[in-house]
Amino acid sequence: MIDTDATAPDFIAPAVAPEADGDGTATRAATELALFRLVEAHDAVVCCTAPATFVPTCTAEFVAVRDAGWHASDDLAVVALTGDSLYAGFAYADRFDLPFPIVADFHGGVADSYDLLADSWEGHSDIPHRATLVIDGDWTVRFAAAADDPLDRADPAPVQRATETLREIGVDAERPRVEYDGAW
């Protein structure tokens, strides 16, 4: 896993992202997500990674971040990254009403650049580990935590531990409440 205080690698990858229609309703669209745009526009970027969509523990964390309202902060960007395709990302975002981009790291290139590539998990290879990263506006990784087992019910969860780092950066972020026993 990438070390804290390291420079975060930039990436451009396909993603499912929220998009506002002209009538004010939100839809989702396929896009290319460029990390540098988020880093330039925010004080911090949180990247939550998962080996695949619909992994219950990862979903619990993504939903907790959604419910904490991190996506609505002007000084914070949230990105989820999974080892699945855009099509799975669309279904996942719709099922759990996720209001932040979901990057499709189908071949593991982004995960590899962050040293978060799992050799294999449940018969899949070259997929991301479950992790949470906080990147500040200077491209410094300020927080990095990964789980050896994506199904581990970490207490506190990495997204909860990341809250303190966000506050140190100056981002007023509510601490997410991760409920692993939800309807995932």
Regions found by a protein language model. Give the residues of each.
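Chalcogenol-based redox active-site neighborhoods
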Residues: M1-W184
